[in-house]
């Protein structure tokens, strides 16, 4: 044993010996994280090998930088680089546990949101998490205890060259094998899981940095010709209004109710013999209500902000980060601006602070007249949970604010209580939790019931006030509530194994539209959040033909029932496409690649590509539809000057006095 320690000390006291030891530790730790934390969809032997192999080139290249330092400083720099890479890996692990996604450079600009997460972050931490820094600790101990005794020499340049040649060679082999299994990996991939699976988490960070820089320069290089190409494409996908529904809600108020993290399976679901959402179940059966039961969320990293962006603009969120934080000052042709020029007053009600998701900036670009944020509400400790005000006091305190608005109005109420990790006071829980053993899944049903009761109270007010009879009410789920990291618990809830296909089907969220005097019913056509704006505008009697919108009217006979996901997958009534595999949507059985699938994929890729071009290039500055006046963000100010909330005043055009 003593001889082994002496030999180890001699090896580790050599720059290359210590370097190789650190490389092996980082390599194995990263691979362990891949197989235990990430669901990357490994499907063949090449992918299994690459998952094991891909951390090696990153470890060699990045840790190799430390060899440029002399003597003991090389060891110190190696430890620092190892620590930074460990922090990056662990940050991705924690982020993935909730979002099932990886951190990108644009998401770092959303870091001001993290301070409001409250208990959500702690629910994502595990007792074994310190192990992600075990290799760093080992390296520090070896140096601090002088177990290693570095010689004060500088490594020869030719040896340094060999290290980097080896790293580049390893990466080249990695990339070559990846391209053989997934051709054009770096040029036609919308899914970050692909890059991590084939090239690794560290190389993904470099790739993402390049993509982010490319996107930031796209605006400077854009011109009106880009917009012409986009409009030519959209003219071929436009769905004309259905005369049966066009203008049925003309002149009516619009009330959006944002159902936070609400998945469609909750509707009509019974837990222990009790309906989880009795009010919403009954509301979907109202004689004037259209309930879309094949409606999917299409959010990416922006989650709630992506959902809002799609509903207000009928354009997709970004492949990395959030439009709200990264493109807030673009030119938009949003719903509040379109309707504002028809005499509507627009407002958002939200029990969180206005800076969350950069709403106080992006709403100005959308043309919202007013934004009632947390500063208008009583944010006492009893009524605040997680991200902000609980839903029942939120709706109660929103009523006097709503009463200040001139009609017709376009409004949105953003709820918060039904948010991960779904905490709820025992006194407010009116249904027992599920019993899967997964606390987030179990309490999800209790917070969903609380949301259901909150919405009922608000609808009761609308009926009593008379607003119910002259307002279009739109309820929508913004994104999933339970990610695929909880598949074991969800298998118990759904009574079947939650594989990739079943998880894709679970991305359904409710879309419920009630128009007074219009015949309702269950609508089975497939659609997504991108389709809501053209559907609503047509109900209000505004044709969308001249607007730049990537969705289409769900009620139009010409609506194409292919629902793109942000990562390039899609679902349709016949086919569900997931990462190069295809399934019969009705049965879940694998199907062969067909011409129909090829056409669908081309349409999905074009829609995502052109939408990204419009957003990244800020192309709407080059095109103004006839009759539309571009928004002037400087006109809007959301500062709460009047703390007496029942006395908030608005001018005739809905702006703050």
Pin down the residues of each PLM region:
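Solvent-exposed soluble domains appended to multi-pass membrane proteins
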Residues: 234-657
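Conserved acidic functional residues
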Residues: 133, 197-217, 261, 470, ...
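Intrinsic-disorder-associated interaction segments
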Residues: 5, 13, 17, 219-223, ...
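General structural signal for secondary-structure boundaries
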Residues: 99-107, 122-129, 221, 304, ...
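Generic alpha-helical secondary structure signal
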Residues: 47, 72, 105-108, 112-115, ...
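Membrane-interface junctions
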Residues: 14, 71, 120-127, 223, ...
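Transmembrane and membrane-interface helices of multi-pass
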Residues: 2-209
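Membrane-interface segments at or immediately adjacent to transmembrane helices
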Residues: 174-251
């Amino acid at each position: 044993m003593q001889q082994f320690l002496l030999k180890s000390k001699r090896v580790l006291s050599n720059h290359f010996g210590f370097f190789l030891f650190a490389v092996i530790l980082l390599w194995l730790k990263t691979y362990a994280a891949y197989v235990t934390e990430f669901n990357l969809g490994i499907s063949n032997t090449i992918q299994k090998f690459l998952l094991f192999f891909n951390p090696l080139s990153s470890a060699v290249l990045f840790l190799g930088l430390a060899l440029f330092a002399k003597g003991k400083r090389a060891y110190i720099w190696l430890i620092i680089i190892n620590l930074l890479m460990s922090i990056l890996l662990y940050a991705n692990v924690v982020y993935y546990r909730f979002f099932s996604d990886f951190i990108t450079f644009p998401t770092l600009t959303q870091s001001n949101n993290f301070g409001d997460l409250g208990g959500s972050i702690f629910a994502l931490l595990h007792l074994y998490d310190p192990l992600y820094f075990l290799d760093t600790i080992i390296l520090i101990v070896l140096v601090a205890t002088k177990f290693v005794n570095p010689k004060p020499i500088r490594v020869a340049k030719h040896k340094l060259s060999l290290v980097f040649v080896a790293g580049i060679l390893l990466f080249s082999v990695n990339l070559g094998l990846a391209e053989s299994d997934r051709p054009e990996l770096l040029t036609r991939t919308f899914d970050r899981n692909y890059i991590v699976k084939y090239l690794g988490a560290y190389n993904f960070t470099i790739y993402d940095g390049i993509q982010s820089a490319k996107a930031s320069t796209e605006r400077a290089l854009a011109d009106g010709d880009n917009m012409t190409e986009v409009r030519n494409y959209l003219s071929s996908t436009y769905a004309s209004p259905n005369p049966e529904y066009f203008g049925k809600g003309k002149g009516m108020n619009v009330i959006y109710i944002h159902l936070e993290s609400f998945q469609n399976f909750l509707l009509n679901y019974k837990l222990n013999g009790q309906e989880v959402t009795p009010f919403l179940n009954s509301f979907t059966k109202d004689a004037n209500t259209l309930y879309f039961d094949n409606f999917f969320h299409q959010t990416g990293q922006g989650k709630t902000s992506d959902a809002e962006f799609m509903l207000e603009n009928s354009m997709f969120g970004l492949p990395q980060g959030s439009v709200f934080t990264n493109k807030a000052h673009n030119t938009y042709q949003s719903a509040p601006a379109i309707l504002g020029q028809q005499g509507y007053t627009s407002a958002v009600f939200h029990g969180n602070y206005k800076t969350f998701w950069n709403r106080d900036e992006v709403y100005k670009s959308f043309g919202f007249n007013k934004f009632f944020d947390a500063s208008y509400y009583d944010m006492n400790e009893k009524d605040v949970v997680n991200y902000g005000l609980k839903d029942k006091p939120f709706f109660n305190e929103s009523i006097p604010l709503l009463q200040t608005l001139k009609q017709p109005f376009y409004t949105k109420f953003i709820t918060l209580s039904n948010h991960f990790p779904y905490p709820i006071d025992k006194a407010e829980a009116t249904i027992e939790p599920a019993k899967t053993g997964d606390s987030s899944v179990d309490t999800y049903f209790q917070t969903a019931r609380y949301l259901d009761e909150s919405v009922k109270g608000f609808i009761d007010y609308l009926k009593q006030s008379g607003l119910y009879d002259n307002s279009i009410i739109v309820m929508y789920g913004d994104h999933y509530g339970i990610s695929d990291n909880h598949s074991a618990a969800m298998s118990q809830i759904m009574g079947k194994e939650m594989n990739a296909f079943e998880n894709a089907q679970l991305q359904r969220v409710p879309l419920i539209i009630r128009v007074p005097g219009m015949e309702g019913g269950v609508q089975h056509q497939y659609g997504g959040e991108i389709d809501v704006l053209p559907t609503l505008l047509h109900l209000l009697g505004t044709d969308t033909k001249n607007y730049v919108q990537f969705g289409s009217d769900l009620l139009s006979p010409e609506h194409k029932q292919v629902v793109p996901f942000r990562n390039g997958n899609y679902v349709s009534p016949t086919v569900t496409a997931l990462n190069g595999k295809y399934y019969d949507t009705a049965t879940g059985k694998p199907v062969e690649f067909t011409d129909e699938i090829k056409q669908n994929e081309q349409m999905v890729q074009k829609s995502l590509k052109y939408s990204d071009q419009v957003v990244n290039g800020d192309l709407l500055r080059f095109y103004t539809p006839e009759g539309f006046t571009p928004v002037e963000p400087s006109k809007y100010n959301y500062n709460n000057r009047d703390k007496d909330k029942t006395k908030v005043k608005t001018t005739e055009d809905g702006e703050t006095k």
